[in-house]
Amino acid sequence: MNSANPCCDPITCKPKKGEHCVSGPCCRNCKFLNPGTICKKGRGDNLNDYCTGVSSDCPRNPWKSEEED
């Protein structure tokens, strides 16, 4: 049970009615971050990872191709 989280229903620990998410890199104030919001900066051959706007997870983006150098 996570009663300290304002997004979390204390009984089910799922998002409260009307809220999108409880936690995650793409969740802020119980709502999904906008699509295209950087959730993880790229390093080396990895590109930036971006929020989708429909999930609190930060999906992995593909590696940079040689054409992008």
Curated annotation (Swiss-Prot):
GO terms for cellular component: extracellular region. SUPFAM superfamilies: Blood coagulation inhibitor (disintegrin). Keywords: Cell adhesion impairing toxin, Disulfide bond, Hemostasis impairing toxin, Platelet aggregation inhibiting toxin, Secreted, Toxin. It is found in: Secreted. Gene3D superfamilies: Disintegrin domain. Pfam families: Disintegrin. SMART domains: DISIN. It comes from the Eukaryota. InterPro entries: Disintegrin_CS (IPR018358), Disintegrin_dom (IPR001762), Disintegrin_dom_sf (IPR036436). Transmembrane segments: none annotated. A motif (Cell attachment site) lies at residues 43-45. Belongs to the disintegrin family. Dimeric disintegrin subfamily. Heterodimer with EMF10B; disulfide-linked. Extremely potent and selective inhibitor of integrin alpha-5/beta-1 (ITGA5/ITGB1). Partially inhibits adhesion of cells expressing alpha-IIb/beta-3 (ITGA2B/ITGB3), alpha-V/beta-3 (ITGAV/ITGB3), and alpha-4/beta-1 (ITGA4/ITGB1) to appropriate ligands only at concentration higher than 500 nM. Weakly inhibits ADP-induced platelet aggregation. This is Disintegrin EMF10A. The lineage of its organism: Eukaryota, Metazoa, Chordata, Craniata, Vertebrata.
